[in-house]
Every structure is written in C-alpha cells, then in structure tokens.
C-alpha cells in the first residue's frame, strides 16, 4: 500500500514539474498581435479586347472562340487575344472548339 502511494505521488510530482501551467508564463505568440490584410484587385468583368490586343486573361477577350494566347515575338513572350490556332483548316477548327470549351469554363462575370 505504501509503495503504491509513493509511486502515485512521484508520478504526480513528475507531471507537475514536466508540464507547467500555461497561465504561469505567456508564450511568445500570445504577446504578438497578428493582422491580415486583404488586397482586392480589379479585373476585367466584360469582354473588352479584340483579336490582336494584349491581354492577361481569357475574360478580357471578346468572342466565343477567342482566348488570351501566348506567342513569341523576337524570343519574347507576348499575350494577346487570338482565335486562330493553326494554318490547317481541320486543326484550326478543332482549336476553335477547344477555345470555346476553355471560354465556357473560364467563369467570367
């Protein structure tokens, strides 16, 4: 009986020493104040650019099969509104179909 009381008392002392109360000392995160800043960027809400105009998103380009595509001019990447995807009529037709699907899922407002 005495041995079990000694074991329990020792266990409680170890627990108290090993796990101090949170109230006894504030941790560093409790002392700091955290803020979050939300920045809202205005984006195009309607199709306003024609084929050949520079763009950043599909929503900016006007037309069901017109997308904001990337071309390389002098080794430099340029984004512009385009609907032609190939010189081949068959491939161009397939490309316009893909552009239409891409515009459908762009969720432009």
UniProtKB/Swiss-Prot annotation:
Disulfide bonds join 55-68, 59-108, 61-81. It comes from the Eukaryota. Residues 1-18 form the signal peptide. Keywords: Disulfide bond, Ion channel impairing toxin, Knottin, Secreted, Signal, Toxin. Coiled coil: none annotated. Transmembrane segments: none annotated. The keyword Disulfide bond applies. Expressed by the venom gland. It is found in: Secreted. One of its GO terms (cellular component) is extracellular region. GO terms for molecular function: ion channel regulator activity; toxin activity. Residues 19-46 form a propeptide. The keyword Isomerase does not apply. The presence of a 'disulfide through disulfide knot' structurally defines this protein as a knottin. Putative ion channel inhibitor. Belongs to the neurotoxin 25 family. F7 subfamily. This is Hainantoxin-XVIII-4. It comes from Cyriopagopus hainanus. The lineage of its organism: Eukaryota, Metazoa, Ecdysozoa, Arthropoda, Chelicerata.
């Amino acid at each position: 009986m005495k041995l079990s009381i000694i074991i329990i008392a020792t266990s409680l002392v170890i627990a108290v020493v090993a796990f101090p109360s949170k109230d006894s000392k504030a941790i560093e995160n409790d002392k700091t104040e955290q803020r979050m800043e939300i920045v809202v960027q205005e984006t195009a809400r309607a199709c306003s650019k024609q084929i050949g105009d520079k763009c950043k998103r599909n929503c900016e380009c006007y037309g069901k099969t017109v997308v904001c595509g990337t071309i390389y001019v002098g080794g430099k990447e340029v984004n512009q509104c385009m609907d032609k995807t190939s010189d081949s009529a068959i491939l161009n037709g397939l490309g316009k179909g893909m552009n239409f699907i891409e515009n459908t899922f762009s969720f432009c407002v």
